Every structure is written in C-alpha cells, then in structure tokens.
A protein has these predicted regions:
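Nucleotide-activated sugar donor-binding and catalytic core shared by glycosyltransferases
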Residues: 1-226, 231-383
C-alpha cells in the first residue's frame, strides 16, 4: 500500500487520509519510515494473544469512529488481512464505497489460507472498485458475478520492490550497510532463504518444515538463512530443531530494505509468503512454496514458483534438485513475472481520479496461461 499512498499524496486532485491499525507493528513501522509516511490515524489495536473475533470487533468499533470523523468519499483497503475485512465492513455499514487493492486472489478453499481466503472474499463482495493484480484474478471476480468494476493494475507490491531495488542499486553506502548485516554469508556456497509464518502450518506443519531444513543442513554445501517470525508458534519449533546447526543462520526479522537485499543474495527461496511469491520472481529467484495450494496460480503457470507443501520429503527433494543443478536455478532469471511492471499505483490513482489509463499490459499474457482459482501441489505447470 505504501507506493499507492505516495502516489495519492502527489496527486492534487485527491485528498488522502492514512489510517493504520497496528497489525504487524514491527513491519509497519519499518515501512512507514522507509517510504516517509506519517499516518493521520494510528489505532494501535494489537494486543498479545487476542482472538480474531476480538481483534475484528475492536477494529470495526475504532474504524467506525475514524469514518464518522473524516467522512471520506471512499475507503481503500489492501489484501486479505483482518484489518482489510474489518475496514471494508465498517465502511459498508456507513454506506461508504470501498476499493479493494489486490482483489480477486483465490485458492477455492476457505480454510487455505485461513482466515485470509474468507477475508478477501468478503472485501470483494463489499467493494464497488476491485483492483485486480492479474487477468486471472479478474476472471475469478467475474466468475463470482460480483457487481463492482474490475480493473487489472498489476500488484503494488512490485511497485514497492522496484522502488527499493532502485534505491539499493543507486546507493553504494546503503548496499555496504545492508551487506554488513549479512557478513555470516559465505559467497562460495548457495544460500537457501527461508520464511514461514502461516497459521495453517502451526504445530505439525512447522515440525515437518524444520525437520526438512535440518536434513538439508546436513548436506554441508548449503547455507540456510531464516529470518524467524516473532510468533511463538513459529519460534518454538524453529529454535528447538535448528538452533544449534552450524550452517543454519536464525536471524531476527529484517526491515524491508534489508530483506530485499537478502533476497538479491539468495540462491533459492523457500517460503509460505504470498508477497514473496510475487517479489522473488521479479528478482529472478527460484521460489518453492511450503503450501498445498496458492492463490497466485499465475506464478506456477509461468514456472517461477513450485508448490512443495509441508511434507519433509517433498521439501528436501525439491530443494536438493535445485541445489544440484545450477542450470535449473539460472533458468529462473529468464522467466516472466506476471504480477506487475512497477506502475500499479499509478493506474489505481488514475482510475480514482477519472483519468484515462491502460490496464496492466501483461494481462493478455497471464490470461493465456491455463490457470484457475488456486493451483495445488499436483499442478503440472512447473517445468
């Protein structure tokens, strides 16, 4: 959302008001500082171990106060978080039109991911403007016969990535500062970057993931770098199974610029993150996704992503195949990224202002790929 906020700030025809709820506080503060954004409202609603229902009720009540005070003509929400669904519902209750950024992502299974799949479906039902990242997402929305206008824009996450990469590339001092945080990396060995935080993997799923990483670490010819999520459901099994392995580097979560630099230096990325599924292909990196289904089937069809699930054997087999074949890794640098060209935010602002614009040009390419809502682990698109 940050690139869109900056585009809105720069447009004299639109007055924008930024409200943050405090969900994912550590990451939020980093992004606000990086993009020089000062929220007009910071609700600071997150507390430890709160239930989703408790969070949603507090969000709706607090957001209702903001809407009553500001009386906006439109509310924009992003993605599939509880913040997004609660914001859309609060706006609906006040009959304020809603625009959904990153609309139309689907797995077809309400429990994968949970609760995100239901969150984004709810937001799309409420929205009268849906900014779909791809033609595949647009097709999902049309298949549901939703009444709102659907516009293919590309994803704003690619805007943020390109802005950040340009900053890193242009600033040698910044690169040196970022690399100084990664002095433990041995450039003579491939780097496996791991991120994992999905609720549906808590418990048995993370136990299997950690067992797979421990087995891969025994190869000795790979370095595993894992910025460990702050959630204790993640930290517990990760520390127990991987904390004492010499070629496994468990580090604190990085700020966005630092994480982009780490992705640039990675050889393979193993993740359950939706955003990383979009960002890493833009950097030419192989992505193995530790989920059984994805709402981003375009990447599977394009060959930039492979679903490996959370079974130990599947993870080990997929990572080993790439570690043992430099040529297979190199192929990813030549593949298409179907998620954006860095101009999604500009298209969204033009649509809001009523100015002419062209939809995401790669939409025709994505539409030609044989994908449906959600690709599962049995998909044959990956070559």
């Amino acid at each position: 959302m940050a690139p869109l906020v900056k585009q809105l700030e720069a447009d004299p025809s639109i007055e924008s008001i930024v409200c943050v709820t405090g969900q994912h506080r550590e990451m939020l503060n980093q992004v606000l500082e990086l993009f020089d954004i000062t929220p007009h409202h910071d609700l600071a609603l997150m507390t430890g171990n709160q239930t989703l229902n408790g969070l949603a009720s507090r969000l709706i009540a607090s957001l209702d106060d903001v809407l009553a005070a500001e009386k906006p003509d439109r509310v924009l929400v992003h993605g599939d978080t509880t913040t997004a669904s609660a914001s859309a519902l609060a706006a609906f209750h006040r009959q304020i039109p809603v625009g959904h950024v990153e609309a139309g992502l689907r797995t077809g299974n309400l429990m994968q991911p949970w609760p995100e799949e239901m969150n984004r479906r709810l937001v799309d039902v409420i929205s009268d403007l849906m900014f779909a990242p791809t033609a595949g997402s647009k097709a999902n929305l049309h298949a549901e016969s939703l009444s709102g206008r659907v516009i293919v824009t590309g994803n704003t996450v690619i805007d943020a990535l390109f802005m950040t990469v340009a900053r890193i590339d242009a600033d040698a001092a910044l690169r040196a500062e970022l690399d100084a945080r990664l002095l433990f990396i041995d450039d003579t060995k491939p780097v496996l970057l791991v991120t994992g935080h999905r609720r549906e993997s808590f418990g048995t799923g993370f136990e299997r993931i950690c067992s797979a990483l421990a087995e891969l670490a025994r190869r000795g010819d790979v370095q595993i770098v894992y910025p460990v999520h702050l959630n204790p459901n993640v930290r517990g099994p990760v520390q127990d199974k991987l904390g004492k392995l010499p070629n496994v580097h468990l580090i604190e979560p990085l700020d966005y610029v630092g994480f982009v630099r780490l992705m640039q230096r990675a050889s393979i990325i193993l993740t359950d993150s939706g955003g990383v599924q979009e960002e890493a292909p833009a950097l030419g990196k192989p992505v193995l996704v530790m989920r059984d289904v994805t709402e981003r089937p375009e990447a599977v069809a394009a060959g930039t992503v492979k679903l490996v699930g959370t079974r130990r054997e599947s993870i080990v087999e997929a990572v080993s195949a790439l570690l043992d074949d430099q040529g297979a890794r190199d192929q990813f640098a030549c593949r298409i990224n179907p998620y954006g060209d860095g101009h999604a935010s500009g298209r969204i602002v033009a649509a809001l202002a009523g100015r002419p614009f062209e939809e995401f040009a790669q939409g025709a390419l994505v539409q030609s790929l044989p994908v449906k809502a959600g690709s599962n682990i049995g998909s044959k698109h990956f070559v």
